From Swiss-Prot:
This is Pyridoxine/pyridoxamine 5'-phosphate oxidase. It comes from Escherichia coli (strain K12). One of its GO terms (cellular component) is cytosol. InterPro entries: Pyridox_Oxase, Pyridox_Oxase_CS, Pyridox_Oxase_N, Pyridoxamine_oxidase_dimer_C, Split_barrel_FMN-bd. Catalyzes the oxidation of either pyridoxine 5'-phosphate (PNP) or pyridoxamine 5'-phosphate (PMP) into pyridoxal 5'-phosphate (PLP). FMN binds at residues 67-72, 82-83, 88-89, 111, 146-147, 191, 201. Changing H199N: Reduces catalytic activity about 4-fold, but has no effect on affinity for substrate. Homodimer.
Length: 218
């Protein structure tokens, strides 16, 4: 098969979206109410990693980057994730805190996009979550200098065993280079797939202490 033939096959991959629609009359005033409902349904549908979200950032040259992390908490203040503070995404957030999040619930023909500003969590918040993690995950946080170049996986595995021995007694301390971010809720868009590509899109945009809701063309 030539590259062109393969490209033509990819171009014809499509399906109809038939899971259901989203109507303005059914929308709650608060987007978190709808987000919680959709997240709960994603969990009930046993989707793999329903809390997985794409985090998009940009560097100082305007180059965008994306990666998948796990949502660990959400409320009216924002959505929370944790990471190595020496990572590429953490450095980019320090330089430009404006980010977007995307929850891709393909099986349910849904996606949710969040736009806001990321801010560092307090040490107390980070410590509380860090010590709730499995012990091996706590040790793993110490091992990797995230986004740095390494010559082989064995380096990580050897370091893990070394630190597991070092921390075998007592509590694993919180690394100074490990933390979290809370992304504020400025805009939240809900997308529901529709037949004939007539998808339903609704944008919640914060205006003072209320939410403005607009339907967007697909």
């Amino acid at each position: 098969m030539s590259d062109n033939d393969e490209l033509q096959q990819i171009a014809h991959l499509r399906r109809e979206y038939t899971k259901g629609g989203l109507r303005r009359r059914d929308l709650p005033a608060d987007p978190l109410t709808l987000f919680e409902r959709w997240l709960s349904q994603a969990c009930e549908a046993k989707l793999a990693d329903p809390t997985a979200m794409v985090v998009a950032t940009v560097d100082e040259h305007g180059q965008p980057y994306q990666r998948i992390v796990l949502l660990k908490h959400y409320d009216e203040k924002g959505m929370v994730f944790y990471t190595n503070l020496g990572s590429r995404k953490a450095h980019q957030i320090e330089n430009n805190p404006r980010v977007s999040l995307l929850f891709p619930w393909h099986t349910l023909e849904r996606q949710v996009m969040v736009i806001g500003k990321a801010e560092r969590l307090s040490t107390l918040e980070v410590m509380k979550y860090f010590h709730s993690r499995p012990r091996d995950s706590q040790i793993g946080a110490w091992v990797s200098k995230q986004s740095s170049r390494i010559s082989a996986r064995g380096i990580l595995e050897s370091k893990f065993l070394e630190l597991k021995q070092k921390f075998q007694q007592g509590e694993v301390p919180l690394p100074s280079f490990w933390g979290g971010f809370r992304v504020s809720l400025e805009q939240i868009e809900f997308w529901q797939g529709g037949e004939h590509r007539l998808h339903d899109r609704f944008l919640y945009q914060r205006e003072n202490d209320a939410w403005k809701i607009d339907r967007l063309a697909p």
